[in-house]
From Swiss-Prot:
It is found in: Plastid, Chloroplast thylakoid membrane. GO terms for cellular component: chloroplast thylakoid membrane; photosystem I reaction center. This is Photosystem I reaction center subunit II. Disulfide bonds: none annotated. The lineage of its organism: Eukaryota, Rhodophyta, Bangiophyceae, Bangiales, Bangiaceae. It comes from the Eukaryota. The gene is psaD. It holds the Pfam family PsaD.
Length: 141
C-alpha cells in the first residue's frame, strides 16, 4: 500500500455508533487507518463494539491517533496484518501520513534509524555499583 490514501476505499461494516467522537473530529481533525484484510472477519473497535473488516482494502476513520494505534496493535497480533498505515485528515481535506513514519515500525530494526539510549554491551558486562561508590562516576558512564 502506498503512503497516499484513497478516500474511496471501502470501510468495515460497523452497526454501532462512535458516541459522537467523529462529529467533533469533523471540525478539528480526524485520523484514518488503512489495512488490507485477508478475509472477512470480526474485530473489536477501539470505541467499543465490533465491526466486520472487508476482504481486501479497508479504511476506517477514528477521532484519536491512540485509537488507530490500538486497532493497529490488534490487527498485528490477532490477524497477523502488518501493512496498516495511519493518516491525519484535516477538515480542509489535507492528508498527512503519520505511521509508520519511515516505513518501518518502531519496534523493528531499520538500518537508517539512529539508536537512542543504547549501550554496546550486554547487561552482564555492566559495572558493579560498589566499584564506583565513592568515585565521582555514575554506573551508566
Amino acid at each position: 500500500m502506498p503512503d497516499t490514501i484513497n478516500l474511496n476505499m471501502p470501510s468495515p461494516t460497523f452497526g454501532g455508533s462512535t458516541g459522537g467522537w467523529l462529529r467533533a473530529a469533523e471540525v478539528e481533525e480526524k485520523y484514518a487507518i488503512t489495512w488490507t484484510g485477508k478475509n472477512e472477519s470480526k474485530f473489536e473497535m477501539p470505541t467499543g463494539g465490533t465491526a466486520t473488516m472487508r476482504n481486501g482494502e479497508n479504511l476506517l476513520y477514528l477521532a484519536k491517533k491512540e485509537q488507530c494505534l490500538a486497532l493497529g496493535t490488534q490487527l498485528k497480533s490477532k490477524f497477523k496484518i502488518s501493512d496498516y498505515k495511519i493518516y491525519r485528515v484535516f477538515p480542509n481535506g489535507e492528508v498527512q501520513y503519520l505511521h509508520p513514519k519511515d516505513g518501518v515500525f518502531p519496534e523493528k530494526v531499520n538500518t537508517g534509524r539512529a539508536s537512542v539510549n543504547s549501550v554496546d554491551h550486554s547487561i552482564g558486562q555492566n559495572i558493579n555499583p560498589v566499584d564506583v561508590k565513592f568515585m565521582n562516576k555514575a554506573t551508566y558512564d
